[in-house]
């Protein structure tokens, strides 16, 4: 339980914050379609990694 609190919560918060900030940067910047598409893929990958981290603990 202690490991869960000390590791899972900070990692989860950091990873989701990174994902959300990445999403905000992508949606606000005027990028061409291909860059935006890559950005969306990165966001999906980011959430996938964060969910995998959650499953690990």
From Swiss-Prot:
This is Defensin-like protein 302. It comes from the Eukaryota. Disulfide bonds join 19-39, 26-44, 32-46. Keywords: Antimicrobial, Disulfide bond, Fungicide, Plant defense. One of its GO terms (biological process) is killing of cells of another organism. Belongs to the DEFL family.
